[in-house]
Amino acid sequence: MKTELKGWLADNTVTTDNKEDKILVLESAGNLTLSDVLDEMKKEDTGLRAETLKHAVDLFQRTVSELVLNGYSVNTGLFRAVPQFRGVIDGGVWNPERNSIYVSFNQDKDLREAIARTNVKILGAKGDPVYFIGGEDAATRATDG
């Protein structure tokens, strides 16, 4: 599958002294769920039934989750998942109200290679946001501002 990301040029708010300095803001293609991903997988001629694909993906996710939460750094080729602790440990005791577990995900070799092959399309300048400071009800002429 050919990959392409689209984006809008916007002012870089970090460098306010340089009006020509721009960043690219992603034009989202939408949000997908696991079910959507499985539907895309079914389009491939794998010879596998939909239930088999779902079972394999569920097994993969459960296994990676269990391995990470048992202290392993898991490298899948697509990503690397590493567990970390957050918060200060008072008196050498773990306190779930003040401490938490966080798992960081970093892109790995397969994803980096796919990124290198991805086309980027600039859609133009991002328009200024619209601000409404008041309104009037057409029927009652009531205003909110």
Whereabouts are the PLM-identified features?
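Strongly charged
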Residues: 1-55, 59-145
